[in-house]
Amino acid sequence: MSTNKKVQSPKEESIAKMLICKVHIGTKNLENKMKRYVYTRAKDGVHILNLAKTYEKLQLAARIIVAINNPADVVVVSARPFGSRAVLKFAQYTGAQAIAGRWTPGMLTNQIIQKFTEPRLLIVTDPRTDAQPVKESAYANIPVIALCDSDSPLEHVDIAIPCNNKGKESIALMYWLLAQEVLYLKGTLPRSKPWNVMVDMFLWRDPEQFELKNLAIEETAPAAPHLTENQFATEAPYEEWNKKEEWNDNANEEWKNPIAAEEW
């Protein structure tokens, strides 16, 4: 009996990971310009995205990123908390600039502010939550790559990567695949070897979970031995308590003589 396992192509392997991370799950609402990326509609009304087109747009986005000579000219933005860790890790491995959290208005248009920047490419996690940088990029003539769900507006978006941009697993995998493809195209990572960085490194982690975990560890840890008051106290020997001292002139004879200058 043959036990040979079929070797998956890079495309099949990537799509299999997308299915596990629910990248294909869209929303019940559908933007008119996103119809081309929808495969079907489930019975519960949720639109299912075409992962073949997701993979194609992912490859196209990676080639655009590699075409920019200076990686620092690429800005990755995520106002959504689930994408904050993913954009930071993407910037770490590709050399791009990451802006996680609130976007300061005017960063692309107002030259007076301290955080003013002039990137050549903008990558956003969600065109709806990151509407401010997308709008400013249109004024500054900066191309935009966006992770777009079935209900995402495509205004001022040049490259739309259809995917689930609301789940933390989906966002982490998309930035992981994009970073991996960028490293492949740059030659930093050979295609014959798998990337030793796990997708979990791009996954968002709730700080409250760490606090609860630390509290659970403290509760289960063995308590320190309790010491009684008698163990803290140190008693002097009985002889010292009943020892009689002389407080006459003979006992204080050494204090009467003045100190010589040589002793100083």
From Swiss-Prot:
Q: Which Gene3D superfamilies match?
A: Glucose-6-phosphate isomerase like protein, domain 1 (3.40.50.10490)
| InterPro entries referenced in this protein's UniProt entry, alphabetically | Ribosomal_uS2, Ribosomal_uS2_CS, Ribosomal_uS2_euk, Ribosomal_uS2_euk/arc, Ribosomal_uS2_flav_dom_sf
Q: Which UniProt keywords apply?
A: Cytoplasm, Ribonucleoprotein, Ribosomal protein
* One Gene Ontology cellular component annotation held by this UniProt entry: cytosolic small ribosomal subunit
Q: Where in the cell is it found?
A: Cytoplasm
GO molecular function, one example? Answer: structural constituent of ribosome
* Entry keyword annotation includes Ribosomal protein: yes
Record-annotated disulphide pairs: none
Q: Would you identify the family this protein belongs to, as annotated?
A: Belongs to the universal ribosomal protein uS2 family.
Q: How does it assemble?
A: Component of the small ribosomal subunit. Mature ribosomes consist of a small (40S) and a large (60S) subunit. The 40S subunit contains about 33 different proteins and 1 molecule of RNA (18S). The 60S subunit contains about 49 different proteins and 3 molecules of RNA (25S, 5.8S and 5S). Interacts with ribosomal protein S21.
Question: Under which name does UniProt file this protein?
Answer: Small ribosomal subunit protein uS2
Q: Which organism is it from?
A: Plasmodium knowlesi (strain H)
